[in-house]
Amino acid sequence: MREKIRLVSSAGTGHFYTTTKNKRTMPEKMEIKKFDPVVRKHVAYKEAKIK
């Protein structure tokens, strides 16, 4: 089953993306580079739980 996750910016701006991932095939925490419009740069986004 795919679970909803939140990708939080490592730049500390508070910006986040939401996405889904398959926990069975990817049990580790996701980390991906995406664009942060607050700092207008590509930064690392790390997985966090949706509250």
Swiss-Prot record:
Alphabetic keyword roster: Ribonucleoprotein, Ribosomal protein
Record Gene3D superfamilies: Ribosomal protein L33
Pfam families assigned: Ribosomal_L33
Gene Ontology MF terms: structural constituent of ribosome
Cross-referenced InterPro entries: Ribosomal_bL33, Ribosomal_bL33_CS, Ribosomal_bL33_sf, Ribosomal_zn-bd
Family: Belongs to the bacterial ribosomal protein bL33 family.
HAMAP family xrefs: Ribosomal_bL33 (MF_00294)
The name this protein goes by in its record: Large ribosomal subunit protein bL33
Origin species: Hahella chejuensis (strain KCTC 2396)
Origin organism lineage: Bacteria, Pseudomonadati, Pseudomonadota, Gammaproteobacteria, Oceanospirillales
Gene that encodes the chain: rpmG
